[in-house]
C-alpha cells in the first residue's frame, strides 16, 4: 500500500466510524504562544479538550502536518542520521471529545491494524504498553482484545517525577494530558533490540506505531492535575512509520514517498547515492521548508522564521557536501508538489512562492557558506583537543550565518563537539533580553485582579450613550477616584472602541453633573473595555451614571484608514500574488501601516498600480457590507481570517469594493461606502525583516495634506534651481551633472596636490635598516587625501614605510603604508595598531596599507616622531 493510499484508508475508516474528517491545521499554531509549530494532531483541538470550545462533532479524524525542528520537540540534529527522525511528518489521528473513551479507542485501533479489510497486520507481531496504574486499559487489551499478558508491558513513572512516564502523555509543561497506551510492531529477531520497558528497548526491533492517549487532565503551570470537563481521546500514528511497516522496509527513507524524493534530489545533484545521509537530509528538509512557506512562514533571524532559515541552510550545506556549486534546493519543489499536492492543494497554489523564497535564501547563504567553511576548516586544523571553541561557533553564526546546529553537524562528522558554554558567553553580549512592557501598563492577571462581567460594545451604531460605571481602578486597585487621579473605568456598555485588530482605541469624554473624565485610550482586557484616562473634576465610583461620548472626528479618520487597509490588502494579493498575508497593522487617525509577507522590495511600478487600484475602488463608492454569521459560512464566502486573531463562533464579515473585491473577518469600525475614504496615497514602502515588507499610507484629508506638502516641496525645489514645475526634473539633473563634474575636478586637483606633497615629503625621509621612512602630519587634509599621498610616496620611495596623519573635528586620522617589496620585513597593520594606541584609538589593516584613528590629538606629534624607532625595533 502506497503512502497516499494509506492516508486515505485511515481517514475513510474513521469516517465510517462516525468521525468527521477535519483538514490539517496550519503549521503555525493559532493563538497558542506555548507552541513554536504544530507538532501533533491534537494541537488544533486543544480548546475542545479543555472545554473552552464546542463544535458540531464529538468525533474527528485527521492527517495533520507536523514540524519538529525547534523548541522542546526538536528532531533537527538527528535528521538524516537515523531511520525515523524527520523535521516534517504527518500524524494520523482519531479524536473523541467527551464521546467514546478507552474501550472504543482500543477497539478502533486494533481493528484498523489487524482487520482483513484494513491493514491486516499479523497480531503476533504487535506489542502493547500501558501506564502502570491503568488497570482498565490492561484488562481491555488482555481480556477483550485477547493480547497475551506477556506482550502487554506496564510502564511506570520512569522519568524522575510523578506522572513523568513514557506512558503518561503531555503536550508540554502545561495543557491536556493523561495515561496512554502504545502499540509496537516487532520487526523480528534479525533486528537488534528488546521489547518496550526492557534495557534493550532503544534498539530498532520494536517500533512504536500508534499512541492512544486517554485525555483526563489539564496540567496547570504549578503542576496541579485538574480533571477535564469530559474524558476524551487523542491518538497519533506516524504516517511514515506505519507505511514502512506495511511496505516491509525498516527505514522511513525506504518508503515510496521518500524514495521518489530521494531519486529527484539525486537527479538534481548529479547522481548522488540515495543512501547518502546528506541526500536524506535534503529530501527530508524540502518537505518542512515547503510546507512552512506555504503556511506563511518566511526566513528571518527570529522565531519561526529563524527555524526555517536553519533548515534551509542545513539543506544547502549538505547539498554543498554532495558537490552542489549552485542553488539546487528550490528545484526539488516540483517533485514534492507532484507527490503531495493532491493531498495538500496549498502546495500547488504556493509553488512559485516556495521556489522564489528558497532560491533567494540559497543565494544569500552561498555568499558566506564557502568563507565560513574555510574558517571552520582552519580552526579544526589548528585544534588541539576535540572541542570547537565557542568563539568560533559564535563567529560562524554572527558573521557567516551558520546556525549552531549546522556547525554541530560538521563537528559531528569529524568526531568533534562544540563549546556551547563559550558560545553562550559570546552571545550574551549582544542578546537582547528586554521584554516588552505589559500592553496595559498593569498585568491584571499577574496582579490577581479579576474584572467581573462583560462590557457591551455599542460603538458600531452609536458615538455616545448614557451608561453606568461598573468598576473604577486607581493604580490597579478598586477604589473611588478623585480629581487628578489617573485611572481605569469599566462601563456596563460603551460606544468606545477598544484597541484590537491593529486599530487604536477611541478617546473622548465621560461627563456627569459636576464631573468630567478625559478618556485618553480604550483597551481590552478579556471581555471588558478599559477606559484609561484622567479624572479632571468630580468623583468616580461604581454605580455612577455618566454620558459617554467618543471623539467623533478622530473615529471618522481612523475608520477611513482601517477600511483602506482592507482594500490595500486585497490589492497586494491581486498584484503581488496570493502568498501575501497580513503580518501586522496599525490604524490610527493620522495614518495606516500595513506589514505583509513578500520576499522582495515592491517596485515603484507595482506601488503605482497598487495605489491606483485602491483609488479606483474608492471612486466606485460601493457600499461596505457587514454580515454577522458563523465561521463556516464566512469561510464559504471566501472571507480571509487573519493570523493571530481569535474568532468566536459568531464572526463579522466585511465586504467592500466591486465584485466583492475584499472579504475579510474584522471587528473594527469602518466607513459606510468606499467613497468615504476620499483619497489614498502611499507614503513609504520598506523592509522590516527578512520576508516582511511594510507600506505606510494616508487617506482623506491626511492624503490631501500629503499631496499639498509634496506640491510645496516641488515648487520650492523649482524656485531654488530657477525652473518651473514642468522643468524642475531637468533642472535638478543639470545641477547634479555640474556637481559631479566639480567633484571630478576637485579629485584631480587633490591628486596633483598629493603628488606635490609626496614629492616634498619624500625629501624628509630618513633611512632605517635599508628602508626609507616618512612620518608626517598633513594639516587640512582628509582621509582620502592621506591615502592618495601615501600611494604617491610609496611609488617615489622605492622601498620604505609611510605614516601620514591629520586632525579632523578633534579626532586623529592615521594612514600607514609599506611598499610591497618590504611587507616581508614589516607590516603596515602592526604599525597602525601601535600608533593608534598612542593616540587613544584603534587601527589595523593589510600588510601594505592600514588605517586608524584616535581621540587624543595632543599626543600625535610624539607618536609620529617615534615611528623610525619602532620600525628599527620591529623590522624582520
Curated annotation (Swiss-Prot):
Pfam families, alphabetized: DHHA1 (PF02272), tRNA-synt_2c (PF01411), tRNA_SAD (PF07973)
Catalyzed reactions per annotation: tRNA(Ala) + L-alanine + ATP = L-alanyl-tRNA(Ala) + AMP + diphosphate
Single Gene Ontology BP annotation: negative regulation of DNA-templated transcription
Location relative to the cell: Cytoplasm
Molecular function, one GO term: alanine-tRNA ligase activity
SUPFAM superfamilies per UniProt: Class II aaRS and biotin synthetases (SSF55681), Putative anticodon-binding domain of alanyl-tRNA synthetase (AlaRS) (SSF101353), ThrRS/AlaRS common domain (SSF55186), Translation proteins (SSF50447)
Keyword field: Aminoacyl-tRNA synthetase, ATP-binding, Cytoplasm, Ligase, Metal-binding, Nucleotide-binding, Protein biosynthesis, RNA-binding, tRNA-binding, Zinc
GO cellular component terms, semicolon-separated: cytosol
Main localization category: cytoplasm
Classification via InterPro entries: aa-tRNA-synth_II/BPL/LPL, Ala-tRNA-lgiase_IIc, Ala-tRNA-ligase_IIc_anticod-bd, Ala-tRNA-synth_IIc_core, Ala-tRNA-synth_IIc_N, Ala-tRNA_ligase, Ala_tRNA_ligase_euk/bac, DHHA1_dom
Residues annotated to bind Zn(2+): 562, 566, 666, 670
Name of the molecule in the record: Alanine--tRNA ligase
Organism: Marinobacter nauticus (strain ATCC 700491 / DSM 11845 / VT8)
Source lineage: Bacteria, Pseudomonadati, Pseudomonadota, Gammaproteobacteria, Pseudomonadales
